[in-house]
């Protein structure tokens, strides 16, 4: 697996987009294929780095790529974009920040045509917030937005 910075997304590495505490804890492999690495590069270049540049602050990724066994272990959907390296769950310090990040992606679509497949603002019952952003590698993005509480 590549470990360095992602070309065109200088604040992100392949290692951080493939990191999984669940995989580590359960001894599961979370090594991506070349296709997944290519998708992660697109994710970082089109979505994560522009978000970082716009807000000028560190963007913390809770989860991006998940190998099938890792996805199953975390209770992920069997059709999750995480399996292809086309999704990231971005940690947000507050609901306000989560909404600001979501608005950023919506504005980028409206102004620049950079579409997304899913944009889910989520909150755990314990109070943590994250924003899930995904894209379709075929460009068939549904622009699906949803708010969820776990």
Sequence positions of predicted segments:
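Extracytoplasmic cell-surface/polysaccharide-interacting catalytic and binding patches
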Residues: 1-52, 142-150
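A residue-level signal for beta-strand positions that form part of recognition/binding surfaces
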Residues: 58, 87, 130
């Amino acid at each position: 697996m590549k470990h360095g910075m992602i070309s065109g997304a200088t604040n992100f590495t392949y290692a951080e987009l493939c990191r999984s505490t669940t995989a580590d804890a359960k001894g599961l492999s979370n090594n991506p294929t070349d296709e997944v690495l290519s998708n992660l590069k697109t994710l970082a270049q089109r979505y994560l780095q522009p978000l970082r540049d716009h807000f000028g602050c560190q963007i913390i990724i809770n989860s991006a790529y998940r190998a099938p066994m890792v996805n199953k272990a975390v209770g992920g959907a069997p059709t999750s974009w995480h399996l292809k390296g086309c999704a990231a769950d971005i940690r947000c310090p507050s609901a306000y920040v989560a909404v600001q990040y979501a608005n950023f992606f919506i504005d980028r679509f409206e102004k620049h045509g950079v579409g997304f497949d899913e944009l889910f603002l989520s909150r755990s019952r314990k109070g943590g917030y994250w924003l899930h952003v995904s894209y379709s590698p075929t460009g068939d993005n549904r622009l699906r937005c949803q708010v969820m509480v776990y």
